[in-house]
């Protein structure tokens, strides 16, 4: 007798359940999607013991008649598709017909449903995949699923469940996801003791965000919306001999995105606050996560993550949702188009977070402070300055520190983001609240409107120009001095500022390097003696890959043996040990990705490393003229609130904070 056997339907369903249902949240997901597909406007979810003992999902959708209700528990029975061609135009959340039989095979299930227009409903009870009871039942229109004792007949699966609180948190996160995606529906989530979520229907997504996260989070979010047409190439078309005279090529459709992204000041330690929906379907996709990360590159630290709520809409033929039974993994026909579109849309939204007119007007109205400072003369790529010469000494005094030349009109290879300067906060994670009474003794006496007397009321204090820090406000800063020769103390009508001189100069140099490179006006100096640098094997491989990009940034280097390179010229301001450290850092950083990095990423990393090693260091005294110049140049940058590595540049104590500290208000 043969060794191969055909598995029973019950065993097959339990195996399928391993892919579809791995925890209580998976059950909730499948039942929620069924309710949404059934056009429900109110969905109630109840759980006990984290979903182990009880999961109940009740909706007021279209319901089912008895025959359909019984057939729904057969494998691959569905009302969503009829043929394989329908897979190309799936518009519903469910379509595989696997969820209900899989859930019924590993739990004790009861379903009560009544179709719209029917007088009576149907009650079906199933345990371990065996139908126990089917009878008429009185019920309101809609469907109610009650799942008890999940994994009761598969103890090996049950023991892998986490603590009740952990499982409940997964269920809560899932319901929150769908409540955000469908603001027109009423969602409720209840545990055995209290209500966890009650979100009535609203008209706008922003109202739903307010319901779930509150006003504080909503104020830290930036709305975004963008669209672009898809490329026609690759669309399925019939052969010429099968086309009729009235044949028209298929419309490729549009790619659209709308939603919210967080301001740079709001940062998280993981990706749990990134919500992604494609055609209202919850997905977790690496490509989209990478595009979001790229959109925030050089704006927040690489170890921090933004908050994002993104709804992507595209024609069904552009996305394949039939990749995994859980339907959270998808594939895109034009993945590179989607990635670049989403990355650029995020950057543009950050740029438009506030009107740019105020910043541009401030720049045009202010006289550049840099006109009174010595500057290095720009040279073409072919020109070099011998190290050690008198000219090199003059250039090194302000190496890479001259302002961006007004004649350079080309945009930076990344979008300009205009952001409010954050108040006192950490560099990563959720921004903590500023201290209630910042220590500003000494500087407070020079704040406009300051008064030592306590008899003056708030109405006697001149109002500041505005509470929110803006790009224009940086140009109006007046330096007071330095704190330990590392931080610039400055004031304007908005309040008191502390600026990290190193990261501020780093931001100025970073954007200047990118601009100069775009027009091939790189400053370089030739070394009197070539600098020999020994590299590890993987570093030599990486050097060969980015040698051309290094040359565009002012380096002249070539292999000198199997594990050595000879550096003959370098960007102005980089010499000796700093030059060695910078090159090793670039070779290590650009080689840590799991995939081949794009050219723009390599360029920005090289520019960021050059800027970091060339910038003014801490513990460096600056005269008032140099401080004024640095603040003016910082105001000209696209992202004056963070360095290329995401560290904050400035902390602002607003006028209101200062008044509150001295009990004026």
From Swiss-Prot:
Q: Name one GO molecular function term.
A: ATP hydrolysis activity
Protein's UniProt keywords contain Iron: no
SUPFAM superfamilies given for it? ATPase domain of HSP90 chaperone/DNA topoisomerase II/histidine kinase, DNA mismatch repair protein MutL, Ribosomal protein S5 domain 2-like
- What PROSITE patterns does the annotation carry? DNA_MISMATCH_REPAIR_1
Which Gene Ontology cellular-component terms appear in the entry? Answer: mismatch repair complex
- One Pfam family recorded for the sequence: HATPase_c_3
Q: Does the keyword DNA repair apply?
A: yes
Quote the InterPro entries the UniProt record gives.
DNA_mismatch_repair_CS (IPR014762), DNA_mismatch_repair_MutL (IPR020667), DNA_mismatch_S5_2-like (IPR013507), HATPase_C_sf (IPR036890), MutL/Mlh/PMS (IPR002099), MutL/Mlh/Pms-like (IPR038973), MutL_C (IPR014790), MutL_C_dimsub (IPR042120)
One BP annotation, GO: mismatch repair
Q: Which UniProt keywords apply?
A: DNA damage, DNA repair
For this chain, the family text in UniProt reads:
Belongs to the DNA mismatch repair MutL/HexB family.
The function of this protein is: This protein is involved in the repair of mismatches in DNA. It is required for dam-dependent methyl-directed DNA mismatch repair. May act as a 'molecular matchmaker', a protein that promotes the formation of a stable complex between two or more DNA-binding proteins in an ATP-dependent manner without itself being part of a final effector complex.
What the entry lists under PANTHER family is as follows: DNA MISMATCH REPAIR PROTEIN MLH, PMS, MUTL, DNA MISMATCH REPAIR PROTEIN MLH1
Protein name according to UniProt: DNA mismatch repair protein MutL
Q: From which organism does this entry originate?
A: Acidobacterium capsulatum (strain ATCC 51196 / DSM 11244 / BCRC 80197 / JCM 7670 / NBRC 15755 / NCIMB 13165 / 161)
Q: Which gene encodes it?
A: mutL
């Amino acid at each position: 007798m043969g060794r191969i056997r055909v598995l029973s339907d019950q065993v097959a369903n339990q195996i399928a359940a391993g892919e579809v249902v791995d925890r209580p949240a998976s059950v909730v997901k499948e039942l929620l999607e069924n309710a949404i597909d059934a056009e429900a406007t109110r969905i109630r979810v109840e759980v006990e013991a984290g979903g182990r003992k009880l999961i109940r999902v009740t909706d007021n959708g279209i319901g089912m008649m008895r025959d359909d209700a019984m057939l729904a528990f057969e494998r691959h029975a569905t009302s969503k598709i009829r043929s394989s061609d329908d897979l190309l135009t799936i518009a519903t959340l469910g379509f595989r017909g696997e969820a209900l039989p899989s859930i019924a095979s590993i739990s004790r299930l009861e379903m009560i449903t009544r179709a719209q227009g029917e007088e009576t409903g149907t009650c079906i009870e199933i345990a371990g995949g065996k139908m126990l009871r089917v009878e008429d039942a009185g019920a309101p229109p809609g469907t109610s699923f009650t799942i008890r004792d999940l994994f009761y007949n598969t103890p090996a699966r049950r023991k892998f469940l986490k603590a009740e609180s952990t499982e409940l948190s997964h269920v809560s996160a899932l319901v929150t996801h769908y409540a955000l995606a469908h603001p027109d529906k009423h969602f409720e989530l209840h545990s055995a003791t209290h209500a966890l979520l009650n979100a009535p229907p609203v008209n706008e997504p922003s109202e739903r965000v307010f319901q779930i996260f509150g006003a504080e989070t909503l104020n830290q979010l930036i709305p975004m919306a963008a669209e672009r047409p898809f490329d026609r190439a690759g669309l399925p078309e019939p052969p010429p001999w099968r086309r009729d005279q009235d044949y028209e090529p298929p419309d490729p459709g549009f790619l659209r995105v709308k939603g919210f992204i967080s301001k740079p000041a709001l940062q998280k330690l993981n990706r749990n606050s990134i919500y992604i929906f494609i055609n209202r379907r919850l997905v977790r996709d690496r490509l989209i996560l990478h595009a979001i990360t790229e959109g925030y590159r050089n704006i927040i630290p690489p170890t921090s993550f933004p908050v994002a709520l993104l709804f992507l809409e595209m024609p069904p033929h552009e996305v394949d949702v039939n990749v995994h039974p859980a339907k959270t993994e998808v594939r895109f026909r034009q993945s590179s188009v989607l990635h670049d579109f989403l990355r650029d849309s995020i950057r543009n939204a950050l740029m438009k977070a506030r009107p740019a007119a105020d910043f541009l007007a401030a720049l045009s109205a202010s006289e550049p402070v840099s006109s009174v400072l010595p500057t290095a003369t720009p040279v073409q790529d072919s020109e070099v300055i011998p190290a050690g010469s008198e000219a090199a000494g003059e250039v090194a005094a302000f190496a890479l520190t001259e302002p961006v030349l007004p004649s350079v009109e080309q945009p930076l290879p990344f979008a300009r983001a205009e952001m409010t300067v954050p108040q006192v906060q950490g560099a990563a994670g959720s921004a903590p609240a500023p201290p209630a009474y910042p220590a500003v003794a000494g500087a407070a006496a020079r704040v406009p409107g300051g008064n030592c007397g306590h008899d003056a009321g708030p109405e006697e204090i001149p109002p500041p120009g505005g509470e929110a820090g803006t790009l224009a406000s940086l140009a109006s800063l007046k330096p007071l001095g330095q704190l330990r020769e590392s931080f610039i103390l400055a004031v304007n009508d908005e309040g008191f500022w502390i600026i990290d001189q190193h990261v501020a100069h780093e931001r100025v140099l970073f954007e200047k390097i990118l601009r100069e490179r775009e027009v091939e006006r790189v400053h370089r100096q030739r070394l009197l003696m070539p600098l020999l640098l020994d590299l590890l094997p993987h570093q030599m491989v990486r050097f060969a890959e980015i040698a051309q990009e290094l040359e565009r940034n002012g380096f002249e280097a070539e292999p000198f043996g199997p594990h050595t390179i000879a550096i003959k010229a370098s960007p102005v301001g980089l010499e000796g040990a700093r030059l060695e450290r910078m090159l090793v850092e670039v070779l290590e950083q650009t080689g840590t990705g799991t995939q081949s990095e794009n050219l723009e990423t390599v360029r920005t990393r090289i520019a960021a490393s050059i800027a970091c090693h060339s910038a003014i260091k801490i513990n460096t005294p600056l005269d008032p003229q140099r401080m004024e110049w640095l603040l003016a140049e910082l105001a000209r940058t696209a992202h004056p609130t963070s360095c290329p590595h995401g560290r904050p540049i400035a902390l602002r104590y607003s006028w209101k904070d200062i008044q509150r500290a001295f009990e004026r208000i």
